[in-house]
Amino acid sequence: MHQQTLWLFSGIALVLVIATLISETLRWRARARPSAVLDNLVARIRAWWVMAAVVGIAFVFGRAGVIVLFALVSLFALREFITLTPTRRGDYYALLAAFYIVLPWQYGLVWTGWYGMYTLLIPVYAFLVLPILATIGGDTTRYLERTAKVQWGLMICVFCISHVPALLNLQIPGYAGRNLLLIAFLVIVVQSSDVLQYIWGKLAGRHLIAPKLSPSKTVEGFIGGVLSASLLGMALWWITPFAPWHAFGLALVANLMGFFGGLVMSAIKRDRGIKDWGHMIEGHGGVLDRLDSVCFAAPVFFHLIRYGWA
């Protein structure tokens, strides 16, 4: 593992240690009056420890570990999406193809580095073939809606997420062997934006930005969180091939995409009448609840780097 990666993970561990000490101290001091907010905070920090450990182990195994990790993440995310969007028996062949053919094929293409195919397989070929498979059962009830749900699930949960490990395929002059740090940069910046938006919203939030979609998101939280996380991205320029201002700009774009991606996924949840996509991650909900912002940020981040630096 590259020395910069070790320094980065050491910093993450230090932040988590401090957060753990603070949260456990607050909960101990409030032990006479149990607080659901503090309990949730402790659960979230413990979940962050697990997630950081899993990512760290994947990084130890390098390219193979990272691709396998995100393939599994896509599998769990797609399962959550399909489980909470009604399907019928007529969707059997389309779902079979989505889970057992398209998903592994997409990550196989990322593994081989075949850019021309992993950027087209799902938005072109799967987009056309899945409706054909859905017609085999002869079920036309809500046909367009059902087909669109499977297509959307593949786009969000497989196509978009696969662009995170696809960062390993970029050939950036003077940056050979360090592409894992691009993944770390993207995930840290976007996930930090989510946390900082929440903190800024609690501290200064006054005006709701989209009350029907996400009652907890405020204009102040959005501005403060996105800008703070973008400044964090600029501070992390040393792990990237970018100049500080380039790092800020890329972080800003990623954070904006992440924010609006979160709103889109919230709209889908409201449409389905659910609060969380799942319960896999304690304190965070499901995989999609934790990665909804990354889903929208990853493809844009990937292509900006590919056309600007690779």
Enumerate the predicted regions with their spans.
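Hydrophobic transmembrane alpha-helical segments of multi-pass transport and channel proteins
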Residues: 252-263, 287-295
